């Protein structure tokens, strides 16, 4: 997947989650798939672009939800699972297929 296509996918998910990221960056990250700043800047690992659809979707939705919910509480996890299931992405534990 190209960087442009990935950023388009992030924006499609952003509409679904009803948030607007201020910036989307792709770069090499050694320890995690992504991060979200308090200012609305999303940064994704370049390696994520090579992962299966479900893994990418989970990382994208996870970071977008952090724009509304800064923690991993019940609401956060419920919404994460609902958004993924609504798009037909199977949710199993920490990974999505």
Segments from the language model and where they lie:
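Active-site-proximal or metal-binding-adjacent scaffold patches in catalytic folds
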Residues: 1-58, 67-97
């Amino acid at each position: 997947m190209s960087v442009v296509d990935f950023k388009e996918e992030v924006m499609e998910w952003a509409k679904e989650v009803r948030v607007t990221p201020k910036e989307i960056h792709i770069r090499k990250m050694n320890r995690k798939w992504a991060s979200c700043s308090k200012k609305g800047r999303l940064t994704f690992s370049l390696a994520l672009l090579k992962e299966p659809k479900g893994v990418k979707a989970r990382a994208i939705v996870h970071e977008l939800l952090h724009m509304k919910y800064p923690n991993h509480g019940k609401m956060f996890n419920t919404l994460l699972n609902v958004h993924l299931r609504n798009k037909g992405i199977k949710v199993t534990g920490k990974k999505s297929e």
